[in-house]
């Protein structure tokens, strides 16, 4: 339906474009009563002012939105750069997950939001990678010999910094909220000032104000013209009216004189009665001042107030003294408790420190012993490896020796089998001798080689047996060393578990220390508050004593003043006669003024009676003009449909203004057309205004 209406509007605008170009602008009338065109002009200008205020709000919102967008874009660029840096760091270090390494989850902050999207998944991945890199580095960089005093000092410094930062944060948040509220107030004031400026510069409002002021002027001018016309008519019609006016004037003067006489008599009677009262009161006061008693002083209001104030001050001083004594006792008790707690904590910390140092020394000694045993075992292992290699070479030599012996035996058997006596007999004696010598030399060489090989084999066998014995001994020592190693590892595990327990105890003790530090700070704050209150009480006591002394001095001054007043009384009696004379002069002046007032009142009554006469003759035309102007103003401000409610909703399609109730009723009844021009509108075309 709204889409069809928009189409109709576009069609109508396109058809009537040429007519709108030649259509003259609306003009506000400058004088005379307000017309219907002036009312329409007034409505349009009100809508224009409201649209300008909406535009200003929109510009402010767009400016804020642009600032937020620029901040968002800069933050997104920074996040992308930081992500690339972290990715390059992770790639440089290389992420390799190890099963033995425990991730320290307290290093990096976890994500707080529950729904995990793409960005949250990426951040979780980066966090896991950084934890795998940082946790082993932090574990390796932890020192075993940590000084507790340094740790406690650092904790105290950090706690102090945290407290200061919290206080600064609270103050800054309060300042921020105050500045935000001030900025909102200033924006609202600026908008109201802009609206007021628009209303001041609007022609229609100036025209209405002029019409309202001109209405009163018109009434006065009309009354004056009526008077002049009446006078003219009376002079033309009847010349005897002058005599009537003179008669009325004389009668009014006589009445004025009578009223003046009556006022003079009343004022004289009042003056006489007042004079008698004043004389009596003066005599009574003089008698009282001459004969002042203690009862009069006690019954005096100032004396009672001073006495009550003195009592209150004494009671407050006593109460403050009691409170001071109780606070001093509490302070002493708190100081004693604080010293006892400090001594206990120092004792416990020293004992725990000594036990930890002893356990650490034991573990270091055991570690040195285990390392020496390990080094010995490694050296023996290298020796055994070398001996094992020598044994393999000996086995190979023995195999070679066996092969050579077998070869010699085979050659000898062949020699015996192939040796023919016929050949030997064929040889000569010299050849036989040479051959025998050669054989003897060969036999000697063979025997020598055999002996050498035999000695080598025997020495090798001896060394092998020695090595086997050594291996057996070393295996026994190795088993012993393994047992010692396993025992030391068990001891190491127990020490590591004890170390963890001690670490947890140290953490608990540190938490207790931090809690005790907080308690100490709170106690110190309380002590400071109590000392301040004690000082305040002392100051109050001193001030009370000073006030008491001042009151005593004031009482003495009152006694002195009493004597001086008695002296002044005689002087006052002398002055009384002067005052009586002044009183008579004042009474005369007052009587004269009363006479003047009576005359003026009588003139006012006479003028009012004349005005009533003139108003009864010619006031119908003025009243009709006033009614017309009032109806015009009502038509501007009241709804033309129901004529009950004020106009507060404008239809932006045609510019007509009605009340919100009538527009909503028409929308609910699906009568979506303007009652005056019959143009279609929707709920989006309504605009709330303030006339």
Curated annotation (Swiss-Prot):
Coiled coil (UniProt feature): 49-83, 147-459, 491-620
Transmembrane region(s): none
Top-level division of the source organism's lineage: Eukaryota
E.C. number(s) listed in UniProt: 2.3.2.27
Function: E3 ubiquitin-protein ligase that mediates monoubiquitination of histone H2B to form H2BK123ub1. H2BK123ub1 gives a specific tag for epigenetic transcriptional activation and is also a prerequisite for H3K4me and H3K79me formation.
CDD domains listed in its UniProt record: RING-HC_Bre1-like
Gene3D superfamilies xref list: Zinc/RING finger domain, C3HC4 (zinc finger)
Reaction catalyzed: S-ubiquitinyl-[E2 ubiquitin-conjugating enzyme]-L-cysteine + [acceptor protein]-L-lysine = [E2 ubiquitin-conjugating enzyme]-L-cysteine + N(6)-ubiquitinyl-[acceptor protein]-L-lysine
Entry keyword annotation includes Chaperone: no
Protein family membership: Belongs to the BRE1 family.
Pfam families documented for this protein: BRE1, zf-C3HC4_2
SUPFAM superfamilies reported in the protein's UniProt record: RING/U-box
Entries under InterPro entries matching the protein: E3_ubiquit_lig_Bre1 (IPR013956), Znf_RING (IPR001841), Znf_RING/FYVE/PHD (IPR013083)
Protein name from the UniProt record: E3 ubiquitin-protein ligase BRE1
DNA repair recorded as keyword: no
